Amino acid sequence: MAKEWGYASHNGPDHWHELFPNAKGENQSPVELHTKDIRHDPSLQPWSVSYDGGSAKTILNNGKTCRVVFDDTYDRSMLRGGPLPGPYRLRQFHLHWGSSDDHGSEHTVDGVKYAAELHLVHWNPKYNTFKEALKQRDGIAVIGIFLKIGHENGEFQIFLDALDKIKTKGKEAPFTKFDPSCLFPACRDYWTYQGSFTTPPCEECIVWLLLKEPMTVSSDQMAKLRSLLSSAENEPPVPLVSNWRPPQPINNRVVRASFK
């Protein structure tokens, strides 16, 4: 059994359940979206964010992804509306990507794989702590945004420029004055369903908001993301690529659309 989970054949998604039984649960993420089976739910509200760019704190490479961490000690950067019962606090965002431009997203739409997927992780402050929120069905809300290949994205470049400081596993650097809503596509249409974290321990506590419209990045920008290493500074270099979990069974869950 793998001592540490990862994405290789010996410790990858097929083995996660050996250490993390949740990974074989009934409400796992990601899932395949089949748009012909998805119903429009007119009761779904629009969602909105009020993010404070000053709440961005650090960027880090943990060997499995790169993550930007926010100050979530009070209601500073918030997500509201949509399918959610109340406001949620932004805690971090991170990405999943492939080894080339033709795959890398975790969710798929009618069989289409995007180059990458951005996850903005928020938690429900009515549960007082992030740790407590992880135990609740409505504890966490994640906005998922697909990345497709096209023109260069100036806002995304600000994030990419910081990657030079965190090239290897274990590196962390200050990353401030960044409001991630600058990355959002113009269209706010979304799909929503009840699911889990896509990384161990795969807790089933997430209300997903998956945006229909992808954000566009260039092939060069994706190459920059893939230039990160999953190895530490003093180790032989190993590229940080293919950090995505394949789609999981939908079981009895219903995916709803905010749009017709």
UniProtKB/Swiss-Prot annotation:
It comes from the Eukaryota. Residues 64-67 are annotated as: Involved in proton transfer. Changing F197L: Enhanced activity by at least 10-fold. Its main location: cytoplasm. Zn(2+) binds at H94, H96, H119. One of its GO terms (biological process) is response to oxidative stress. Its EC number is 4.2.1.1. One of its GO terms (molecular function) is nickel cation binding. The keyword Metal-binding applies. The keyword Transferase does not apply. Reversible hydration of carbon dioxide. Belongs to the alpha-carbonic anhydrase family. This is Carbonic anhydrase 3. The lineage of its organism: Eukaryota, Metazoa, Chordata, Craniata, Vertebrata.
